[in-house]
Structure formats: structure tokens, C-alpha cells
């Protein structure tokens, strides 16, 4: 469990080097942010421990959510060198929850997403053969399509618990930062019901058809949860795969 003082939060992750990966991710995100206060400040970090500035207490609001959406869009626009690229100064994998994941730069988003994010977790999760076949068919459909998207600088694990609303507005914590599709962060926010989600999307300027594509961007976190949290995520993963196939025609 994180240790909290009046001004800081100290974490010692179980995974070796996870603290360093998180610290480099936070610094990279802060460098790309329009307002550095949108990203938790790293006070100090080592291979085993990370200390961040504690987020001052606050409550979400519609206006704060719209501002957070705008800041997220600006962060994404700051870009990344490639899909899957880790933050500068970090060559290793990153971590989503307790799960380690590959970060090998590639020019093709679909290849990166399918081969480094969805299938590695889906194939290890305890889902049925029929469910795995459905996920693989969804991945084949993703890979078969040409995607007009440039690498964005993304948080990579932006569920509601990693977008805090303090007294100064929205603040992101605990990233799995890498170069990715910008809507990946939107899909994660939608997965577990972020407060004022509609306002976040409004501030972000999300496309009108974003709901159609949300399930595709949830394949990765649902596959991770099916592996790390068990069978309660099997059906949601199955539904997301089916919705992805429907969206891709």
C-alpha cells in the first residue's frame, strides 16, 4: 500500500523497476502537458521506490472534467516517436497494474495493439476457446484495416482511479505511458465509469462516433483484467470483441 505524508505519496511496487518506469512515464507526460499540474509531480525515484507530490483534496465537477478533457487532448497532441515507444530514458517494459507489458516501437498501430497489448493477455487469460477465437477474429479485423492515426503521448492506464480531481483540477497518476492511439485513454476512462465522462469527452473534442470505437480500445484492459482479476471479466471481453467486429463491419 502507498505510504502518505502530508505532502507526498511513497510507493514501493512489487515488480522490480516498476517504480522507475512509472517515474519516467510521469516525467514524459509532464513534459508534453500544456499544464504540468495535470500530471502528478515526481519528487524522487529509484528502481524500487517512487515518491510523488500528494494531490490536494478536491471534488470532480463538470467544468473540471471539461478542462481535464482539454488537457488530455493537448497532451496527446504532443506526440510520440512511435507506437509502443517507452518514455525517453526508459528501455524496459511498463506495467499496467501488476502486469508487465512489452514496449517495442513500431510504425503500425494495429500491429502494436494486437501483438503487444491484446493477444499477449487474452492468450494467457482463462477464457474459453470460443471466447479466445472471437478475440482473435477481432484482432484480425483490426490488423486488416488501414488506420489513419499518428502516435500520441498517452497515459496508457487511465481508468477513473488514475485521474484524480484535486483542488487544482484533474491530475493524472500511475501511468503505463507509451506512444499509442489517443482514443485508448478515452476507452479506459469509459471502462469503469469516470465521473463526468460526457464532459471529459466534450472538453477533449472526441469524435461523434467515439462510442462505436470504445469497445475496440477496451480489448486490452479487459484482457488484462481477465488474466489478473479472473473470470468476471471474460464476458465483458467477449462483448467487446463482438462489438469490435461489428464496428469494423
PLM ranges: what are they?
Residues 80-153:
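An alpha-helical support segment within catalytic cores of ATP-dependent transferases
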Residues 102-114, 149-153, 160-215:
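Active-site Asp-x-Gly
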Residues 1-7, 246-249:
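Short, low-complexity, intrinsically disordered N-terminal peptides in bacterial proteins
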Residues 28, 74, 112, 120-123, ...:
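Residue-level signal for well-ordered alpha-helical scaffold segments within enzymatic catalytic domains
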Residues 21, 39-43, 71-93, 115, ...:
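Structured catalytic cores of enzymes that bind and process phosphorylated ligands/cofactors
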Residues 3-111:
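ATP-binding pocket architecture of kinase catalytic cores
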Residues 24, 36-41, 123-140, 178-179, ...:
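A conserved long alpha-helix in the C-terminal portion of kinase-like catalytic domains
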Residues 47, 167-169, 219:
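Short strand-connecting beta-turns/loops that link adjacent beta-strands
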